[in-house]
């Protein structure tokens, strides 16, 4: 059901496209988006699914969190809200039909933040996500794909980096929402851990060094 015509085939003569430069994203403030988050039963935060990608041998394969991500999507209810922090697949994957079958599992309102691997045309993503942005602000939180440094008020929830300890000094008010097992955070979980001084390191919570 979730197979792709590209799986198991070598990518011959493939020239990797340059990633989009989103390290300094345009930060969106959207009242409708913020109201949907305010009124949701549960707000989930996830990113870096990398559902398919090309290995070192040039073969397209499913990512290691492929099936756990689908299981998480099926738990969502219509009155939930999903914040996706970018990188649906690795950027060499171009099978839109296979990706459509995954995205059709989403049954709640959503926002997608474009990651460096999200290089398909924007109109494709807009078919499956209610909002598609480079970054956005909700209350005192900025959501982005790349971590944003130099926050003095509020904080930044981001993807891209799968561990946090390397970036304690660089991003002291940032929280990455990656989980190795593919499960989704709730926004309440993230706020609770951040306020207690913990960072997320591959899904394990470590007390931030002072």
Model region roles, listed by residue range:
Residues 46, 85, 113-115, 144-146, ...:
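Conserved beta-strand termini and adjacent loop/short-helix elements that scaffold enzyme active sites
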């Amino acid at each position: 059901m979730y197979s792709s015509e590209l799986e198991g085939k070598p990518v011959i003569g493939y020239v990797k496209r340059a990633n989009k430069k989103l390290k300094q994203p345009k930060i969106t403030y959207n009242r409708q988006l913020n109201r949907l988050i305010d009124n949701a039963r549960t707000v989930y935060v996830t990113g870096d699914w990398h559902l398919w990608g090309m290995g070192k041998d040039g073969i397209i394969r499913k990512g290691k969190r492929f099936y756990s991500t689908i299981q998480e999507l099926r738990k969502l209810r219509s009155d939930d809200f999903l914040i996706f922090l970018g990188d649906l697949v690795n950027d060499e994957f171009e099978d839109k039909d296979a990706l459509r079958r995954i995205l059709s599992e989403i049954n709640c309102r959503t926002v997608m933040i474009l990651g460096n691997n999200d290089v398909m045309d924007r109109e494709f993503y807009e078919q499956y996500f209610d909002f598609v942005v480079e970054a956005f602000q909700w209350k005192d939180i900025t959501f982005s794909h790349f971590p944003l440094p130099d926050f003095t008020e509020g904080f930044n929830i981001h993807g891209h980096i799968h561990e946090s300890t390397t970036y304690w000094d660089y991003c002291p008010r940032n929280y990455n929402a990656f989980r190795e097992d593919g499960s989704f955070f709730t926004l309440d979980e993230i706020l609770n851990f951040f306020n207690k001084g913990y960072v997320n390191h591959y899904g394990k919570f470590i007390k931030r060094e002072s």
